[in-house]
Regions:
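A short, conserved, highly charged catalytic patch centered on acidic carboxylates
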Residues: 1-113, 120-146
Length: 146
């Protein structure tokens, strides 16, 4: 995967996961660099990473349905979701609200790993039996339960 340059206005980048050119926004810059790291350094198969993946509709208390997209989902070799990743631009802090957002996605997917990343910091959580444990480092591909 080619190394990305810093985002500039009116720039596009080829996303190998979506197989198309996309606008190189600050969030996209963070996304592409982190996903490249997953593949190159942590040995995650690129073919098992879905980007901007539509989630099943969420039924809200008002009765309306709300459609969401996960920034990235890592799947097992048997196509079970293992990890949800939420990206923010490097100027956006990771907050409890960001964690709550990804936790809502996880009510639908029930994955064992949640990751938040903004280019400067990464929050990695292991979810097991409704308990969240924060991890110091990203698990290698061969450490995931798959």
């Amino acid at each position: 995967m080619p190394k990305l340059q810093s985002p500039m206005s009116n720039s596009n980048v080829f996303c190998p996961f979506r197989r198309k050119n996309v606008a190189l926004t600050p969030e996209e810059y963070v996304r592409q660099n982190f996903l490249r790291q997953l593949v190159e350094q942590h040995h995650y198969p690129a073919s098992l990473i879905a980007v901007e993946k539509a989630l099943p509709p969420i039924q809200q208390t008002s009765g309306n349905t709300h459609r969401k997209r996960a920034d990235a989902i890592v799947y097992s070799s048997s196509m079970l979701p293992l990890m949800i990743i939420e990206f923010k631009a490097d100027s956006v802090p990771l907050t409890r609200k960001t964690l709550d957002q990804i936790a809502v996605y996880n009510t639908q997917l029930n994955v064992p790993y949640l990751v938040l990343h903004n280019g400067r910091e990464t929050v990695i959580a292991r979810v097991q039996d409704s308990q969240i444990t924060f991890l110091d480092q990203l698990p290698e591909w061969n450490q995931l339960s798959h």
